[in-house]
């Protein structure tokens, strides 16, 4: 945290020194569901000279005044996600800074306004891919959920869902591994009951991660699970959906995960929140090795701070793109249809949270 604040302060001081009348910080830090010392509010609270902060990452819609290190108010704003709003930041002639959101762009009559040239350009791009995106790859008899079925709020970053189960199963089965891991942050959309098109699959996995299989110790498996729930009950992109494994989270135990300055896992400094970890019917043995299927983002790059997984022997290296694992699993192992096995939107009871 301190290194970040110092670097931001140096940049602000440099801008002021070069004659800037106003300093607007643009960041992708966020606030909810992340480590507090790296939040936009913490940066503001530990610096001076910033007039306004335009932030992102946590998909919040907000306009707030946040005190800086000297107690002066700084405008903090976010516009949500997926172009739900257009942000507007205005510096008035008397030096006041005002932030607002525009949720709909309309013409003089109040109708949705579209730029004809831009719409034509976008439609031209869409037409190039329309045919391939609409190819039917399988079917699901159930809604595959990334959200809580009751609240409609995103669930995959803090709870088991049937789609999370399916994605983890796809990796494990296609790699022939003991265990499958999939991060909640990598599951970007749900799939409604009906035909599954290539576009549907790409909506779930838009990043093109490659699936690998590694040899990983039981201790590293346990550490990864602990890392995945360090923020609970807040969201975490590193929340782990599992296949071939079950575990319980005791949320009454405070997280004691120790991170380095880059938010990578270092150790667990106290009691583990995860317990009752089973691989199949057997308790996890921290002293033996298992084969783990996941994507290169975790197994090779240590994404989401999963540094404990880096350096493990890679047994199958980037054999399939993540989208293909879903469709191949459905066709080869489920007979082309996702059915009763995945009917519960909250999954198959692989993750118990107390």
Outline where the language-model segments fall.
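Catalytic centers of hydrolytic enzymes
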Residues: 69, 80-354
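Functional cores that coordinate and move charged inorganic groups
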Residues: 1-124
